[in-house]
């Protein structure tokens, strides 16, 4: 987004880079930065959030690659994704980490996504990544479920199988 226009033309400036210079940040910055953190600090929990992470929390269509990509949690290798505005999630997470909580306990927070080896039985199951990446109707079905479950009053947890043994689970903000 920060490097190209919708017409895939290169932007010459970047309002969020030092001096407004373009191309100071990598494409898919969240994925690149998480991979660099993993190289330097193998076992450190990585928490991601913001617009890029929020919009790519489930399997999603990537305009630049013209294909459906996995959740950004899979691609980045991050431990936890905080979506939406994240004001309460980041404070709660910081308090948990400061208190020495195990990162495995963090998935109990609201407004987050995490990976697990088994699907949460209370989740609304979305079509799997394999299904949405090969079938347009399944992609549309997954989108409708995601849209419907974003309701702040009646929204439920959602799960989506990403690989044969990994499931993305989303804990709704209103829980």
Predicted regions located by residue number:
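Conserved small/polar residues in nucleotide/adenosyl-binding loops
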Residues: 171-175
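Glycine-rich beta-alpha loop elements in corrinoid/cobalamin-binding modules
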Residues: 1-167
């Amino acid at each position: 987004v920060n490097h190209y226009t919708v017409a895939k033309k290169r932007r010459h400036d970047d309002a969020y880079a030092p001096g407004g210079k373009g191309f100071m940040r990598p494409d898919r910055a969240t994925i690149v930065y998480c991979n660099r953190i993993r190289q330097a600090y193998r076992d450190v929990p990585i928490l991601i959030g913001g617009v890029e992470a929020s919009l790519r929390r489930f399997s999603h269509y990537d305009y630049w690659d013209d294909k459906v990509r996995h959740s950004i949690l899979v691609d980045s290798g991050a431990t936890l994704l905080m979506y939406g505005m994240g004001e309460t999630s980041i404070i709660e997470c910081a308090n948990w980490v400061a208190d020495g909580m195990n990162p495995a306990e963090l998935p109990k927070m609201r407004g987050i996504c995490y990976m697990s080896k088994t699907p949460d039985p209370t989740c609304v199951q979305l079509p799997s990544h394999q299904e949405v990446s090969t079938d347009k109707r399944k992609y549309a079905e997954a989108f409708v479920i995601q849209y419907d479950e974003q309701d702040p009053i009646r929204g439920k947890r959602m799960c989506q199988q990403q690989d044969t043994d990994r499931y993305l689970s989303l804990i709704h903000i209103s829980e």
